[in-house]
Amino acid sequence: MKSKRIKVKIAAYVCLALLGFMTISQFGIKVKADNDTMSMFTGNEVYIYVNGDNAEISNINLENGMVTDFVSPEEVYSWGPVSALLVYTSVMQLCEQGKIDLDASIMEYMPEEFKSGVKFTSDFTVRQLMNHQAGFQNVYYYRYTSNPADLVSLDKLVIDCAPDQIFMPGTTVAYSEYGICLLAYMVQNVSDMNFDTYVKTNILEPLGMTDTSVRASHEDNTYIGDLYRESKYYNYNGEYGLPYYSSMYPALSVVGTVQDMAIFAQGLVSGEVFEKESTKEEFFTPSVLYLDGATPRLANGMAVFKYGDNNEIYGTVGTGMISRAGMLLNAKDGSVLCMVSNQYAPNDYWNKYSQEKFGEMSGIAESFPEDISGRYTKSVMISSGKLSFLGILDTFQIDMAKGKPIAFLAGGDLSNIDGIQGKLFKEGGSTQMQFAYYDIFPYSSGMFILKTGLFILMALAYMYALISIPVGAFIFLKNRFANEKKTPVFRKYYYIQSAVIFFYFLFFLSMCMSAMSSGSPRFTTVVSFTYYIGIVMSFVYLVFLVRTGRKEECSVFEKGNYYINGYNALLVMVFTLIYKLLLF
């Protein structure tokens, strides 16, 4: 089998080189030393480019931007977003066997417990789900955890974490890790096998991929799992820590060597993972176009990149919580480029190597005849539910006066991150930008100012409550020891309301921190009751303020504090209503 020959060849050459018997270049595999200080982050990246029987390995070990010693490609890394290609391949295999129709409703392949546990606003097809067009907003539960005991099963994940649909299916591309997990759940249900078992039986073993783990806990390959747990990962500041587990299984959970990734990539471009050539051809056929109606955008989950004059390259690239990975596939000549990294921070090496192998990037505008300055947001966002406030974090400003936005158009985040190409469209005075995995459209500056201002006011209310509680306790004790005969009746409501605001905001922050890392829906639901308490108690406080507090005889200072807390109570109610934090 061709992929096995490549694997044996790469492994043998690397081992001999590491033992010092031969240089890798003597065996026809080029080890490229790249001394460009393009990245100032600690960590390393490993690249494998395979074209026919020729394999080129580029190992970049970075310490403050300098290339150091050789790094073995047999080290274990997170595959990050490349994990999704195992899911897409599994779906295409079942489609090939006639067990799945890509244009049928996803619900036709779901078990009864899922149908009774999840109710989507609009129906969507398997193909729409593969192309990230099911309309889902971003997911904020069960993303990462450092404790494998916190991992949840795929059955529980797809029910507990079902996001709201904020777009009509088929109208907008919004990359969805949940959607990938739902596809895997479908594969699991149709094949009557656990997803990791299905992949091992139908992809890993046939290709000879022994150095890959699919399951979130990595118990399906304990040797690789142990190596992964011993590895180090680096953040933006060059600080390292232990690897995380991803409950977004299997969208982000796969770990393995870049060598195994290259074997999988070869299996895709050669069609070895499929029984029929027609299945491979369909897999590499564009299924979503850009707004111009001519430029390929997605091919059954894979992004379509434009290199050179007429060179369409398929694959994906992106970052996880602590790493980044990429895979590019040339279906015409069978060449592949794979990359894994133990640093989250993006850099320009990916762009450099991909263009070196496939040709210069094309299709990205160098300048624009019109001013596109303004505030924008991505389709990969949260705009519905208890954490809808996070939507403002997904907005950004483009200012043409500060320079042309070529970096934005090349990367999507106002910097040239991954070389993801995008297209700009102006229609009816509205600006829209499209990238492979998401759309970008204007965001109301007025709404941004309103929501941001409300956040600032809530922060001030929290600080006031934080101060008033200990001050109130001090005054209470002082009066107690001074034998104060008459305590203002309304003062107790004032202190209770201060405590309500304090815990309202404290639990609110706890929920946010938990939800954005490894929080569970159950935790969020429990914490959400603080919203009920906050809004009810705030209403009660306002009623008593009008009926009792404003009439009470007390100092001007104390009366002023009563009214300030009344403002804070009203703010809690407005904040809750605007951000849709109520559970009904």
Stretch-by-stretch model annotation:
Residues 67-128, 165-178, 249-252, 504-507:
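Short active-site loop at a secondary-structure junction
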